[in-house]
Amino acid sequence: MTNVTEKVEQLAKPIVEREGMELVDVEFVKEGADWFLRVSIDKDGGVDLEDCVNINEKLSEALNQDDPIDEPYYLDVASPGAERPLKKTEDFEKAIGKHVYIKTHDPVKDATEFEGTLLTYSEEMLELEVRVKTRKLKIEIPVNKIAMARLAVVF
């Protein structure tokens, strides 16, 4: 369904940007018997319900004219929340100095899950400061090994 999400991104991005917001993510997923088109938006200071309703209405209108999806589905426009996904270079760059959660395809230093402060990011490598018991360690993770990355809330 990557083709669907790419087409929806192309349709949604100008709509979202015209309203002064950022398109964070588009997912098309099946849950039980139902399909959901989830669109995450954000802006400085965060989005509110009115922002989500506004984008939902405008995107729904655009999808009614040029819908790349054949199946019936529910459109859900929302904030990415506190644990925002990190997918694009800009996402990682904005997250430098913040607490993140990283899951890798293959083990790095004998682990596939990491949580810590993002210190640096480049197209090839990122560096995390993680806490192991009472010590802080720096770990380099190749970007091509990242399966999933998101901001993490610290309690």
From Swiss-Prot:
It comes from the Bacteria. SUPFAM superfamilies: YhbC-like, C-terminal domain, YhbC-like, N-terminal domain. InterPro entries: Ribosome_maturation_RimP, RimP_C, RimP_C_sf, RimP_N, RimP_N_sf. The keyword Cytoplasm applies. One of its GO terms (biological process) is ribosomal small subunit assembly. Its main location: cytoplasm. It is found in: Cytoplasm. Pfam families: DUF150_C, RimP_N. NCBIfam families: PRK00092.1-2. This is Ribosome maturation factor RimP. It comes from Exiguobacterium sibiricum (strain DSM 17290 / CCUG 55495 / CIP 109462 / JCM 13490 / 255-15).
